[in-house]
Amino acid sequence: MAAVTLPTHYRNVFAELGYAQAEIDARIENTFHTIFYGDEAHRFYHPTGPGLAYIEDTGNHDVRTEGMSYGMMLCVQTDHKAEFDALWSWVMHYMYMQDGPNAGYFAWSCQPDGTPNANGPAPDGEEYFAMALFFAAGRWGCGSGIYDYAAMARCILHSCLHKGEKPGTGRPMWDPENHLIKFITECDFTDPSYHLPHFYTLFSLWADEADRPFWAEAARASRAFLHKACHPVTGLCAEYSLYDGTPHNRSDRDQRHDLYYSDAYRTIANMALDYAWFGADPWQAENAERLQKFFCETLCGRTNGIWEIDGTSLPGEALHPVAITATNAQASLAAGGPNAEVCVRRFWNTPLRDGPRRYYDNCLYFFALLALSGRYRIWPL
């Protein structure tokens, strides 16, 4: 495997553009407080008893592995260990599956009282859980039991790769042949926004030693896949894709998923963070510039639409326009040129979202805020 060099400096794009550090720090602190401890109209972190708490998907009124793992990542990046442990404890108490073909995975959706809505996992939750746990180990050290963060991360990743090797033990979350993450374990297609090569690079250092070559190859494979999934002019990708990058629309669903829509917004932010941490793929900067040009010049700043990946506008409005603004800004970690500054300043002037759809938008908002301030960091073991 190629040697991995961890970053020693994290860009503070806000400071580069002249924002005062005290102002940046206050924005981060206020954002955390609003999401975790604001009034009922704004927060979506909910303590449920001693040492337990959940993140609510306010648009769907449930608790998802996506949101719980996002919350844990936000907590470790902002040094809030008590909240991290409360979320992780809720996950292990209510979401962890101990029996059946999905044993070792997490039920992707539960009701706020912990009742499972599903008995299957969604792989984006598992990969974020593992990464957040490794960072917790690096930042705070490990405890015992479920708070032996690094051991728990390795257990999750072992399940992700090795389930199904024995009959009746379920399916893996990564295709063992092409090294690409699946949308769900039983489907042979993917979601471009699930591809986190920067995480896999770190897994290649910290996962079970026997699996480290797989994770190194997964990082390479995901970077190559994203070239195929993103449109060569607009930089956009679909929510779901075949392994060759072709947009994919599930035949068993009424809603289209071959468009630039909710899940897809995360993809450009993920690639920008990969570029900021490792700089392994210069194409990521080129693609970020294409996407910003599409939104800033072709669309003249509009972020509330629905588009084919070639930029064709469709009827309807985006459910999560603030998420688009946030991820367009995070793309500036990779992009250069005048549109990078425009996107960051537009984001800085955008408030957190109110209303029932605030969960997804405000999670991506907080990630972008941390990334653009140099506060979304690797916490090495």
Place the predicted regions along the sequence by residue.
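Internal amphipathic alpha-helical repeat/solenoid segments
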Residues: 27-70, 75-97, 102-118
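Solenoid-repeat scaffolds in large eukaryotic assemblies
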Residues: 71, 83-84, 146, 153, ...
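C-terminal functional modules
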Residues: 306-381
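Inward-facing hydrophobic residues that define packing positions of alpha-helical scaffold repeats
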Residues: 75, 88, 133, 150, ...
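Aromatic-rich carbohydrate-recognition surfaces in CAZymes
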Residues: 61-68, 115-141
